[in-house]
Amino acid sequence: MQWSDEAIILGIRRHGESSVIAEVMTPGHGRHLGLVRSGRSRTMQPVLQPGNSVEVSWRARLDEHLGEFRVEPLQLRAASLIETATSVYGIQALGALLRLLPERDPHPHLYEALAVIVDHLQDPADAGELFVRFELAVLNDLGFGLDLSRCGATGARSELVYVSPKSGRAICREAGAPYADRMLALPDFLSGGSRAADHESLAAAFRLTAYFLNRHVYEPRGVDAASARDGFVHATLKALKSASSAA
């Protein structure tokens, strides 16, 4: 059994004296693990860092085996990803989200989204918005997608300012007003509005996705959300607040 694909490194762990087991995200083969012989060598260590884009060739005697990776560098961005807290926490949090999905299950749109996000992790506003959209996409692929396109009560497509915590559907201002204290806020940038993401709207967006991830994924599985997500959210909102104050 063998295949080749482009990939983004999610993480590695030591294996034996000189090898590592690499975890990658690929467009055609999903999240995949493989042994990299001499992966701890001076040549390979800089390549096998989270966030780097590589070409992987996987080979195993049987499909269910761990198999081995041969890895060639494509774009080494890991050095820049350690320069800011948003990028350090961001790449860890993205990997944790992808681990919610079954191993070897292809999600090409998530791979494409990941490739975009890793190049924007140092820009807090872009990174925050892209991360929230990534969480929504993961929820959707797990079968818990939110419907933010129209009001779940009236069918209206305008003035969508709430999300029902029960149905996961958008609710317009008029229909949701009597129950506003029980609703989740829907930021303008997630409802097709023209306002760019800022500190306030991103904070609301992070609360929105956290609620549904906890309800549908973490609590049923009996696990906690990755601490890296909290780190990313804190770093992103702090950076946006500082930028706003400076302006």
UniProtKB/Swiss-Prot annotation:
Assigned GO CC terms: bacterial nucleoid
Origin: domain of life: Bacteria
Entry keyword annotation includes Repeat: no
Organism: Rhizobium meliloti (strain 1021)
Gene: recO
UniProt cross-references to PANTHER family, sorted A to Z: DNA REPAIR PROTEIN RECO
SUPFAM superfamilies: ArfGap/RecO-like zinc finger, Nucleic acid-binding proteins
BP GO terms, sorted: DNA recombination; double-strand break repair
Family: Belongs to the RecO family.
Protein name: DNA repair protein RecO
Pfam families the record matches: RecO_C, RecO_N
HAMAP family named in the record: RecO
This protein's record includes keyword DNA damage: yes
